[in-house]
Curated annotation (Swiss-Prot):
Compartments where located: Cell membrane
Lipidation (S-palmitoyl cysteine): 9-10
Known function: Has phosphatase activity in vitro. Involved in the response to sodium and lithium ion stress (but not to potassium or sorbitol stress) by inducing transcription of the sodium pump ENA1/PMR2. Acts through a calcineurin-independent pathway and is functionally redundant with PSR2. Also involved in the general stress response; acts together with WHI2 to activate stress response element (STRE)-mediated gene expression, possibly through dephosphorylation of MSN2.
Linked residues for Glycyl lysine isopeptide (Lys-Gly) (interchain with G-Cter in ubiquitin): 154
Quaternary structure annotation from Swiss-Prot or TrEMBL: Interacts with WHI2.
GO molecular function, one term: phosphoprotein phosphatase activity
Composition-biased stretches (Basic and acidic residues): 104-118, 131-151
Annotated keywords: Cell membrane, Hydrolase, Isopeptide bond, Lipoprotein, Membrane, Palmitate, Phosphoprotein, Protein phosphatase, Ubl conjugation
Modified residues (Phosphoserine): 110
Name of the protein: Phosphatase PSR1
GO biological process: cellular response to amino acid starvation; cellular response to heat; negative regulation of TORC1 signaling; positive regulation of transcription by RNA polymerase II; protein dephosphorylation; response to salt stress
Classification of source organism: Eukaryota, Fungi, Dikarya, Ascomycota, Saccharomycotina
EC number: 3.1.3.-
Length: 427
């Protein structure tokens, strides 16, 4: 008995070892299958391709399970019963769960795709609806516009028909005369449209004539409003004693000479209240009960210029400065007494706040008056009588006064010509 039992024990151990090795091989194979399935699933998800992996066959697991049962001694259970029952091994459970998860993921993906397709279809339908509405609105607008134009045309036709004179019933004498004219031959007939056109033309011509007359009247009113008699003096404006002009009549020494009007500041001299090292002389001027020093610089060539023009013209210094400054300055500047007259700010014409030198009030013919000034605003009323000159401040190389002398000499010789016409062409 001891020998047999030992043999039986050995056989049972060998059978158990064989069954254990078979069980381990089964587990390793199932794990490898699960790994391959998971790897394939990840690839299909990344590529966006939905692959349907068939679950592992239950027959193999059932066959392996039956073989293990047979080895352990449970041979009474058939393979069909094992297929119906759930496997009790952990590998089979893992495979079942993976297959279930795969099917759920596929269902979810398919549902999402359906939702996206439905959403795209809804958007397309909404866009089509908007296009249809717009097209309907455009068609309606066009139809309304056509209706409006047709109504307007009908109204115009009705108005034309109403405006046309209605034919009056003809008398018997008129009908007889028409029949006689038809027997005699064709006559020229004038349609009502031509008559209406003629009437309209006559109305237009009459209205245009009326508008022209009204425009002429308006122009005359504007001219009356804009016209200013520059020869009239303003209230408080300076004038020569006993005369309504700025200057008295010419005396024997200036008869037959043209009148040359010269500006003072920045034309003949430059003066400043600030200290000037190069000042030719200094004036003491009283302003608001205070004495101020005025530093004066002579323009280069001013003495020679005054000497030359004093022999050719009636020289008048016309400045917008006050007399209490201008008089002492001219006393120093005009040592040879070549300046015949002096006019200051009170002799200027006040036009919109500006001091204008009105040449019409000088008391000399405009054809004989020349003005030399650095400010165009001063001679704005008579620009054709001006000789422009640049403003001078301290340039020691300036020669404009001497350069103008030849032009002035030519103008002084031509006594019979209008100075304004000559200067308007040459300058």
């Amino acid at each position: 008995m001891g020998f047999i039992s030992s043999i039986l024990c050995c056989s049972s151990e060998t059978t158990q070892s064989n069954s254990n090795s078979a069980y381990r091989q089964q587990q390793s194979s199932s794990l490898n299958k699960n790994r391959s399935v998971k790897h394939s699933n990840t690839k299909s998800r990344t590529r966006g391709v939905h692959q349907t992996n068939s679950p592992p066959s239950k027959t193999n697991s059932a066959a392996t399970f039956s073989s293990t049962e047979r080895s352990t001694g449970k041979s009474g259970i058939s393979t069909n019963d094992n297929e119906k029952k759930k496997p009790s091994s952990p590998t089979a459970a893992v495979t079942a769960t993976t297959t279930n998860n795969m099917t759920k993921v596929e269902k979810r993906i398919s549902k999402d795709d359906l939702y996206e397709e439905k959403y795209e279809v809804d958007e397309d339908e909404e866009i089509d609806d908007e296009d249809n509405r717009r097209s309907r609105g455009i068609v309606q607008e066009k139809g309304d516009a056509v209706k409006d134009t047709s109504r307007q045309k009908k109204q115009q036709q009705q108005q034309q028909q109403q405006s046309q004179p209605q034919p009056q019933p003809q008398s018997q004498s008129q009908s007889q005369s028409q029949s006689q004219s038809q027997q005699r031959g064709p006559t020229v007939q004038v349609s009502s449209d031509h008559l209406i056109q003629d009437m309209n033309l006559s109305r237009v011509s009459s209205s245009s004539q009326a508008s022209e007359t009204s425009n002429d009247a308006d122009d005359e009113d504007d001219e009356d409003e804009e016209y200013i008699d520059l020869t009239l003096l303003q209230q408080g404006q300076y004038h020569a004693p006993g005369y309504n002009t700025l200057l008295p009549p010419q005396d024997e020494s200036t008869k037959g000479k043209k009148c040359l009007i010269l500006d003072l500041d920045e034309t003949l001299v430059h003066s400043s209240f600030k200290y000037l090292r190069s000042a030719d002389f200094v004036l003491s001027v009283e302003i608001d009960d205070q004495v101020h020093n005025v530093y004066v610089i002579k323009r280069p060539g001013v003495e020679e210029f005054l000497e030359r023009v004093g022999k050719l013209f009636e020289v008048v210094v016309f400045t917008a400065s006050v007399s209490r400054y201008g008089d002492p300055l001219l006393d120093i500047l005009d040592t040879d007494k070549v300046i015949h007259h002096r006019l200051f700010r009170e002799a200027c014409y006040n036009y919109e706040g500006n001091y204008i030198k009105n040449l019409s009030q000088i008391g000399r013919p405009l054809s004989d008056i020349i003005i030399l000034d650095n400010s165009p605003a001063s001679y704005i009323f008579h620009p054709q009588h001006a000789i422009p000159i640049s403003s001078w401040f301290s340039d020691t190389h300036d020669n404009e006064l001497l350069d103008i002398i030849p032009l002035l000499e030519d103008l002084s010789v031509k006594t019979s010509l209008d100075v304004g016409k000559i200067l308007d062409v040459t300058i």
